[in-house]
Curated annotation (Swiss-Prot):
Pathway noted in the entry: Bacterial outer membrane biogenesis; LPS lipid A biosynthesis
EC number: 2.4.1.182
Record key words, sorted: Glycosyltransferase, Lipid A biosynthesis, Lipid biosynthesis, Lipid metabolism, Transferase
Gene behind this protein: lpxB
Protein's name according to its UniProt entry: Lipid-A-disaccharide synthase
GO BP of this protein: lipid A biosynthetic process
Length: 384
């Protein structure tokens, strides 16, 4: 009697944060069962974990309606590639990570092919387009959600769901002490440090980095000796930011890989919205969140969004723990003013840190990737 063939798993992560979470899941799944093989859409982290990437996720990381339309050709080609792979040689399981509009199209193909679907990191259906939960109920076999408030939402819709904790709770930790990090980055411990976090997508760099740098110039003028540091996302290259830095005339320390060490040396951070706000919250660093998209995207979204906040750390908290500067509010003057308040007002800063500590409590304990890997093995019919 021959041995059963190795199980094949397609995994789809369309942007930098999904690439990171997907890589940790794959590592844990392979630790539990080294015979599994993974292929799909991912970036450098997933490739390093052993995933055969048929499409690079950096090509697909765009935000907003207008931006998606501009990249339609690339996104459609990626969809066609996955559709062909699923229909010609169906995998034993499809794992989808966030990236909802694209991933739901892939889920539909998988459903027709009889492939089981695990959705890890829920689309934000609780925030906007809540009707999508009906489609999820039809196309997805299991949800692995990372926020506790998502569980009753899916249970009400009849979708099998498990709260697995948040993957960031496992990994948000500096690799050295603050004093060691300051020395490693060449920063003066006696001077203030402000983090500039312009995002992981080229579109964000083009749209938001200039105003962040303008705010930094204002801060430089108001706080002599202030220092700036920027963590460069793995999805970007020096060439993506160099022209902006050169035009600004600012001295900015650019760091790769050590993002949590970067965070811990900062007195305050100016950041784009997204997963990074949770990482900063877990590190307990005061921040100001900046969010701008095209006017059309914003007007459409304003009519659809059902939550009171843009920043996911504020959504988790259920209150505005840190300021959000949206669209026309996101000026260099406003950004500099909010950062300046952290630098000048210790009571305000401590109140913010206490709010961020509450966010950490709500994100659960570690072990997220192991719990999701257990679900993967269960759906593949394997014993742990």
């Amino acid at each position: 009697m021959g041995t059963a063939p190795n199980k094949r798993v397609m995994i789809v992560a369309g942007e930098a944060s999904g690439d990171l979470h997907g890589s940790n899941l794959v590592k844990e799944a392979l630790r539990l069962d080294p015979t599994l093989s993974f292929f799909g859409i991912g970036g450098p982290h997933m490739r390093a974990a052993g995933v055969e990437t048929v499409v690079d996720s950096s090509e697909m990381a765009v935000v907003g309606l207008v931006e998606v339309l501009a990249h339609f050709g690339v996104i459609y080609k990626a969809y066609a590639t996955l559709k062909r792979l699923i229909t010609t040689n169906p995998p034993d399981l499809l794992i989808l990570i966030d990236y909802p509009d694209f991933n739901m199209l892939v889920a539909k193909v998988a459903k027709r092919a009889g492939v089981k679907v695990l959705y890890y990191i829920s689309p934000q259906v609780w925030a906007w387009r809540t009707g999508r939960v009906k489609k999820i109920a039809r196309l997805v076999d299991r949800m692995a959600v990372v926020f506790p408030f998502e569980v009753p939402f899916y249970e009400k819709a009849g979708v099998p769901v498990s709260f697995v904790g948040h993957p960031l709770a496992d990994r948000v930790s500096p690799s050295m002490s603050r004093s060691e990090a300051l020395a490693a980055f060449g920063l003066d411990p006696s001077r203030r440090v402000v983090g500039l976090f312009p995002g992981s997508r080229r579109g964000e760099i083009a749209r938001l980095f200039p105003v962040i740098l303008e705010s930094a110039k204002l801060l430089r003028d108001r706080y002599p000796g202030i220092q700036f540091i920027l963590p460069l996302a793995s999805s970007l290259t020096d060439a993506d930011i160099a022209p902006h830095l050169a035009a600004s005339g600012l001295e900015v320390v650019v760091a790769r890989d050590k993002v949590y060490d970067v965070m811990q040396v900062c007195d305050a951070i100016a950041t784009v919205s997204g997963t990074v706000t949770l990482e900063i919250a877990l590190m307990g660093v005061p921040m100001v969140i900046i969010y701008t998209v095209s006017p059309l995207t914003y007007e459409v979204g304003k009519r659809l969004i059902r939550v009171d906040h843009i920043g996911i750390c504020n959504i988790v908290a259920g209150e505005r723990v840190v300021p959000e500067l949206i669209q026309d509010e996101a000026t260099a003057e406003r950004i500099a003013a909010e950062i300046g308040r952290y630098l000048d007002d210790p009571v305000h800063t401590e109140k913010t840190r206490a709010g961020l500590a509450r966010v950490r409590e709500k994100l659960g304990s570690g072990g997220c990737s192991e719990r999701v890997a257990g679900i993967v093995l269960e759906m593949l019919g394997k014993k742990r």
